Amino acid sequence: MSIPEITQTLLQAKKDQGLSFADLEAILGRNEVWIAALFYRQASASEEEAKLLVEALGLDPSYIQHLTEYPIKGLGPIVPTDPLIYRFYEIMQVYGFPIKQVIQEKFGDGIMSAIDFTLDVEKEADPKGDRVKITMSGKFLPYKKW
């Protein structure tokens, strides 16, 4: 998978400015995961958000237009090769159908929205090794009968 040029530019500017995604969350008022998705062109910013980001990163204002364009979503191969991303694929391979069954028992026949959706990543201290806590919250959408 090749990283888009604009993504490389944004990541380098973030590094050059000594900023984290959490720092940018405070500046933009958006979740750090959403901001990372914006960097990878999996989300689009409002003009105001793009201006704030470009200013924080010290980039030329011409980047505002790129950040406000609607992106083509979905990045990378169907089976991911990055080890961290592959773990999520593996989790879905193992637990996808069990999660689906539990959701359907609780909500009925439908899906969890990835549009009306939030995702948070937290670090949990553990004496056996720090843990990654990921919380996904998506609106339940029942299938329509007609």
UniProtKB/Swiss-Prot annotation:
The enzyme's E.C. designation: 4.2.1.104
Catalytic residues as annotated in Swiss-Prot or TrEMBL: R87, E90, S113
InterPro entries with a match to the protein in the record: Cyanase, Cyanate_lyase_C, Cyanate_lyase_C_sf, Lambda_DNA-bd_dom_sf
Record key words, sorted: Lyase
Catalytic reactions on record: cyanate + hydrogencarbonate + 3 H(+) = NH4(+) + 2 CO2
The keyword Acetylation belongs to this UniProt entry's keyword annotation: no
Disulfide bonds: none
Single GO biological process annotation from the record: cyanate metabolic process
Top-level taxon in the UniProt lineage: Bacteria
Keyword Signal set for record: no
Molecular function GO terms recorded: cyanate hydratase activity; DNA binding
Enzyme class: lyase
Pfam families: Cyanate_lyase (PF02560)
HAMAP family: Cyanate_hydrat
Function: Catalyzes the reaction of cyanate with bicarbonate to produce ammonia and carbon dioxide.
Similarity-based family: Belongs to the cyanase family.
Protein name: Cyanate hydratase
